[in-house]
Structures are given as C-alpha cells and as structure tokens.
C-alpha cells in the first residue's frame, strides 16, 4: 500500500516534531533522542544549508523512522527532497506550482493553509490533509472549530504556536490529526546536546496526549 499523508499524520499523532538542524553532526543523536521518547515521524525543515544532508543521514541510519522534508517553498525542492530520501513533504502554503511539483515528485504532501479560501484551493488540488499555519493558540482553535462544518472530512496539523499548555485543546478537536511542534527539540537543547531532556519532552507530550484516551 502506498504511503499517504493521512497515514503519515496518523502515525505522527500526537506530535510531529519540526526540526531545524544547524549542525549536521548532531542530526542522528537528535533523531535517536526523539525516537527514544516515542516519536516515529520527523519533519526536517529545509531552512539550513545542510538540511537535506541531515535528512539523508537519518534515512540511512534510522530506517525505523518516517522522515519528511518541511518548509518547501520552491518547486524544485520537492525532487531534491525525494532524492535525499524524504518520505513526505510539507510546505507553509500552497500554490499551483508547488502542488504540481508535489504530484510530479510522488511524495505525500501536506500543504499549508490559513484561510477558508486557501483550504478550498488545496481541496481543488485534491488535498484533504492540511497544515494550519501559523496556528496561534486560542484563535486557531476557534478557527478549526468553525472549519469543521463546511470542511467535512478535512484533517489538519496545526503548526506554529502549539505548546504543551494548549496541546490538548488542539488534539481534542475531531478535525485535528496531530500537531506540529518545535518545542520538543528547541535549538538551545540541541546545541547543548541535552538528549535526555529532549527525550523527556517527547515522552511528556505523548503521555499528555495519552490522557485523552483514558476513560473518564
């Protein structure tokens, strides 16, 4: 069975870590720390010069993880991400060129949206799993609640502004598949090589989300 974006988000739930890798020598240890905390899906953003090299190294050394490329803002980046071994692609917005490049690459694609018009555009391109970006706390929670009526069957991954304090408020929404988060692997802990703390942050997020599944 071919991998779909819906399958990626289901596996990522509750949190898809959004990684900014500045030092490629730390990439594998970072991925291992997150995996030790129960994380099995990672998004490596293409915001740094060695991001694709880091992604390729993770794919080679950590085959149990599902690893995608994020912050794709140019059409050519989709094929570059695929060549590096990315298993899915994420962008902060959605354009005709990006949608066409995603289709050509064959990668499962999570386009970013913020408004009803952008959701409709993504739907025209056939995408039903969408990234809500930027997600800014209470305002985005209200927006997602309002989206539930007209956009039946659409699943969102809110990203940007999600924290442990509002994580459950997002995950309780029936149209939220998972959330994207940078707080699990903050740059200061990565630079400090504080792998145990990163593992703990990942485990705490999973435990917090697990409370939703507990009987009342």
Kindly label every feature range from the protein language model:
Residues 1-87, 104, 153, 164, ...:
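Conserved N-terminal beta1-alpha1 strand-loop-helix module at the mouth
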Residues 88, 92-98, 131-141, 175-197:
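Glycine-rich phosphate-binding active-site loops on the catalytic face of alpha/beta enzymes
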Residues 27, 55-59, 123, 144, ...:
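Distinct, well-ordered alpha-helical segments
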Residues 20-24, 69-75, 91-95, 111-116, ...:
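Glycine-rich beta-to-alpha transition loops that act as phosphate-gripper elements at the mouths
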Residues 30, 74-84, 117-125, 162-178:
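Catalytic cores of alpha/beta
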Residues 78, 82-122:
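Hydrophobic, well-structured mid-protein blocks that either form specific transmembrane helices
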Residues 116-130, 140-150:
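Anionic-ligand binding region
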Residues 65-69, 87-93, 108-113, 128-134, ...:
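Short hydrophobic/aromatic-enriched beta-strand-loop microsegments
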């Amino acid at each position: 069975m071919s991998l779909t974006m819906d399958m990626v988000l289901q596996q990522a739930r509750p949190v898809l870590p959004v990684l900014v890798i500045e030092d490629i020598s730390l990439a594998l240890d970072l991925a291992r720390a997150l995996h030790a905390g129960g994380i099995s899906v990672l998004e490596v953003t293409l915001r740094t010069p060695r991001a694709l090299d880091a992604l390729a190294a993770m794919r080679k050394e950590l085959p149990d993880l599902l690893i995608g490329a994020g912050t794709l803002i140019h059409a050519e980046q989709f094929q570059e991400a695929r060549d590096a071994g990315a298993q899915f692609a994420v962008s902060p917005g959605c354009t005709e060129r990006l949608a066409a490049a995603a289709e050509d690459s064959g990668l499962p694609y999570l386009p970013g949206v913020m408004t009803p018009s952008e959701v409709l555009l993504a739907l025209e391109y056939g995408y039903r799993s969408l990234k809500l970006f930027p997600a800014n706390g209470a305002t985005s929670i209200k927006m997602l609640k309002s989206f539930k009526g007209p956009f039946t069957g659409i699943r969102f991954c809110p990203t940007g502004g999600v924290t442990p304090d509002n994580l459950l408020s997002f995950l309780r929404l029936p149209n939220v598949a998972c959330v994207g988060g940078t707080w699990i692997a903050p740059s200061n802990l990565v630079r400090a090589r504080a792998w145990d703390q990163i593992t703990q942050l990942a485990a705490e997020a999973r435990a917090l989300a697990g409370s939703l599944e507990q009987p009342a």
